[in-house]
């Protein structure tokens, strides 16, 4: 069996285990897992840019904010999205976030490296400023409270039912993103990440490829925002702040950039560590920061890169003749 097939099988088994085990735990664990699943979609969307296209973005929280605020505003002001029309809100959230990414991308994709990073940072801060200052629409610093979850044949106020909804959309998102990165388009993105000049010489429109990837990542970020609004029950400028984008970036690096699943693993670990460490010490942020630093220093390929590092360090003993053949010839 090919290694890629084994990895897919492991992911499927892990997802099945989550779907079976989590609903049988307490409500706190279920809520924490649901939040991690929703945020994982944002992290995986960022990984399309970071791991597969080589574009580290600090503005991904803007798309989460678009989806979340759209959901909250429609639900509280117009009672829209609380029935079967919830699925329309999902579509609207994806499209609006993708549209915002299309606008941002016209500016950001023209830059590379640290300049791209700074432009996405600036655009993300603009989104935060709107959320913080536009009190009449966003509620300003107080945010918007969602008092009810949708009902469309099933009651999403039930934590188990809501968990399965978020889990299902997470699984679909993972499948779609996996299909994308394994497609010819996704392989072109990997080529652009490694040798953009060579891809240009081969006739690829590298700007367009990166622009499309930027828009797709924004759309999935909007989906994460729609789910996050109902998961958290409140939408505020905290969802759009810089630290949200940084968290997503660090989660992707912790799990392993360019793996998709690694981003989800990173999100689960960070959400779990936050809750656990915050009950032990008041300076839990520093402990979490130490985890990030150690990961970057000693696991630059993230947790998903551990098996490969083990394989590379494994020494297969050979006979003396093999060693002699490998030894350099000296005069």
In which residue ranges do the predicted regions lie?
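Transmembrane alpha-helices and adjacent helix-loop boundaries
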Residues: 1-331
């Amino acid at each position: 069996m090919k290694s890629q097939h084994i990895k897919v099988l492991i992911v499927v088994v892990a997802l099945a285990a989550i779907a079976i085990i989590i609903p049988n735990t307490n409500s706190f664990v279920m809520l924490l897992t649901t939040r991690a699943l929703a945020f994982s979609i944002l992290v995986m969307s960022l990984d399309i840019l970071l791991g597969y296209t080589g574009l580290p973005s600090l503005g991904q929280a803007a798309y989460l904010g678009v989806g979340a605020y759209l959901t909250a505003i429609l639900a509280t002001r117009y009672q829209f999205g609380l029935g079967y029309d919830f699925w329309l809100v999902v579509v609207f959230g994806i499209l609006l976030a993708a549209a915002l990414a299309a606008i941002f991308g016209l500016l950001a994709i023209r830059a590379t490296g640290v300049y791209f990073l700074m432009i996405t940072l600036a655009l993300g801060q603009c989104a935060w400023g709107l959320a913080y200052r536009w009190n009449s629409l966003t509620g300003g610093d107080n945010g918007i409270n969602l008092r009810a979850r949708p009902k469309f044949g099933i009651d999403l106020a039930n934590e188990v039912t809501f968990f399965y909804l978020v889990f299902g959309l997470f699984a679909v998102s993972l499948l779609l993103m996996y299909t994308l990165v394994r497609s010819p388009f996704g392989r072109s993105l990997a080529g652009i990440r490694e040798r953009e000049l060579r891809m240009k010489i081969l006739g690829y429109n590298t700007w367009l490829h990166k622009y499309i990837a930027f828009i797709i990542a924004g759309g999935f970020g909007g989906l994460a925002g729609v789910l996050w609004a109902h998961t958290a029950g409140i939408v505020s400028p905290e969802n759009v702040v810089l630290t949200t984008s940084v968290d997503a970036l660090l989660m992707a690096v912790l799990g392993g950039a360019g793996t998709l699943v690694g981003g989800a693993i990173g999100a689960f670990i960070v959400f779990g560590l936050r809750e656990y460490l915050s009950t032990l010490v008041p300076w839990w942020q520093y402990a979490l920061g130490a985890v990030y630093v150690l990961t970057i220093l000693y696991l630059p390929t993230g947790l998903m890169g551990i098996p490969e590092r083990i394989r590379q360090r494994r020494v297969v003993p050979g006979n003396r003749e093999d060693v002699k053949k490998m030894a350099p010839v000296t005069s």
